[in-house]
Regions:
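Intrinsically disordered, low-complexity serine/threonine-rich segments
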Residues: 8-16, 30, 34-45, 144, ...
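Conserved AWS/pre-SET-to-SET junction and N-terminal core of the SET lysine methyltransferase domain
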Residues: 13, 18-20, 25-36, 42-45, ...
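Compositionally biased, intrinsically disordered low-complexity segments enriched
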Residues: 37-52, 139-147, 206, 210
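C-terminal SET catalytic tail plus cysteine-rich post-SET Zn-binding segment of SAM-dependent SET-domain
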Residues: 102-140, 148-246, 253-259, 394-465
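Catalytic cores of histone-lysine modification enzymes
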Residues: 238-401
């Protein structure tokens, strides 16, 4: 799930607007005409112009990613990156200095650096960032004597500079405390189950029953998209109703909310931390003027956040393939966020925003691996999102390589490229495998490869029949 798979389509918002206009049968109209038209026609024309302006703005934004390539429609559908000029082998055509958001799998949270993703061969990292609420561990210095429970509530880094970088990019410790809050609640859930195995069994059975019920309803739904949207709205309404029963002061005390917060598994834990990273970037965008942050880091994350809005969501396709995810998304992840996320991020927790973040992560994130080479035996540590790199399509005979330097990703040409030639990377770990295995892996991510290598192997296979 955590390989990088690019978006190929226009923003879902723009697509929705365009679809609405097609259904309305709007006709093209020039604003310079002086012919008197009906109000309906005028409104329609203005709406059409407004959509075109948004499309033009999106195109301009995407083409500002790099001077070496432009993002254009491909002849096989969707969008891709095409060289603006002839380019020589070895040319670095794009760099991403840091991800918009990232998440580390819980088993590796003490072994993989939270800033640069460095892995010290399974050793516990020594630089730990504790919650400022923890009076006994109020500093950000190296700690080696914390208790087991304290050690669990920390963010881990490989060095002081990496920890300092994380702190510098934070605002009033909001990101730090948000991530540690998820960790704390996850541990509380584990502890509750540890001492009440019967309750754990009952809740697991109830969850399976809820998943099956939702799956059957999904199969019977006449309008799949409408059904999924309704389930998200129901989840939001249920959260609001439960919160409305508490007084404002009670809502601020997590002890009053703990019984409302769902228990999550490790996959949901990863997803929630990733979502919080995006929510924090949205908060930073809206509040950067009031904080002493590096202008370069703010403008960079703001640009990536704008590009993020243009990525394609594959939420519907993923839910249809794995119906149990709808229960996970709505009744667990969304509810967990709504009930437990810190107050400053709450305005961003809406069904539309969380759906967008989840849907776009499914096919656009890069895996954080133990080694940066195609190898089916390498270990997955987590995943990260670089929106500006999400428009490179896949080819089993790619002309680009990804070079990772810490959390930075560099895209470098491995061959000479002609003007207008598409620039492609390869996805997944099966690049050295046979055609059938490669195709099977790619279909998991709703992608069918018809690159030069695949076509050659298909033709060779057909010739042998």
């Amino acid at each position: 799930m955590w390989n990088q798979f690019p978006d190929n389509d226009i923003s879902s918002d723009l697509s929705t607007l365009a679809d609405d206009m097609i259904h309305l049968d709007l006709r093209k109209s020039s604003l310079c005409f002086t012919t008197i038209t009906s109000p309906t026609t005028s409104v329609a024309s203005l709406a059409e112009v407004e959509v075109q302006v948004k499309v033009d703005e999106a195109t301009t934004l995407l083409n500002s990613i790099s001077s070496h390539f432009s993002v254009k429609p491909t002849n096989y559908g969707g969008r891709g990156c095409f060289a603006n000029t002839d380019l020589a082998q070895g040319t670095i055509i794009h760099e991403c200095s840091m991800p918009l958001s990232s998440t580390i799998a819980r088993p590796f949270r003490k072994e993989v650096c939270g800033s640069c993703f460095k892995f010290l061969c399974g050793k516990t990292l020594k630089f730990k960032l504790m919650s400022r609420k923890n009076k006994q561990n109020n500093s950000t210095s190296v700690s080696t004597s914390a208790s087991a429970s304290d050690a669990s509530l920390a963010l881990y880094f490989c060095s002081q500079p990496c920890m300092d970088q994380f702190i510098a990019l934070d605002i009033d410790d909001l990101y730090r405390e948000s991530l540690l809050n998820v960790e704390s609640l996850f541990i509380k859930g584990l502890n509750e189950y540890q001492y009440d195995l019967e309750r754990k069994k009952q809740e697991e059975e109830a969850e399976i029953e809820a998943e099956l019920k939702l799956e059957n309803e999904l199969k019977q739904a006449k309008n799949i998209e409408l059904f999924i949207s309704q389930k998200w709205q129901e989840a939001d309404i249920n959260c609001q109703l439960q919160l409305s029963k508490l007084k404002p002061k009670q809502r601020k005390n997590f002890n009053n909310l703990i019984y409302l917060i769902p228990k999550i598994n490790e996959n949901e834990y990863m997803e929630i931390k990733y979502i919080i990273g995006i929510l924090f970037q949205m908060y930073k965008r809206d509040n950067c003027e009031n904080n002493k942050l590096s202008l370069s880091s703010v403008s960079l994350s703001s640009l990536e956040l704008q590009i993020f809005q243009l990525l394609q969501s594959n939420e519907i396709e993923k839910v249809l393939k794995y119906p149990y995810l709808l229960h996970s998304y709505t009744n667990k992840i969304y509810k967990f966020l709504k009930m437990s996320t810190l107050e400053k991020l709450q305005p961003y927790i809406t069904p539309s925003i969380i759906r967008s973040i989840i849907g776009k992560s499914l096919t656009n994130v890069f895996g954080i691996w133990s080694i940066d080479e195609p190898d089916e035996n390498k270990e997955l540590f987590g995943y990260s999102l670089y929106p500006s790199a999400s428009f490179f399509n896949h080819s089993c005979k790619s002309n680009l390589i990804k070079i990772k330097k810490g959390s930075k990703i560099i895209f470098k040409l491995v061959k000479n490229i002609q003007k207008n030639e598409e620039l492609c990377i390869h996805y997944g770990n099966s690049i050295n495998s046979v055609l059938e295995i490669r195709q099977k892996d790619l279909k998991e991510w709703f992608f069918e490869c018809l690159c030069e290598r695949c076509l050659e192997e298909m033709n060779l296979k057909n010739a042998k029949k």
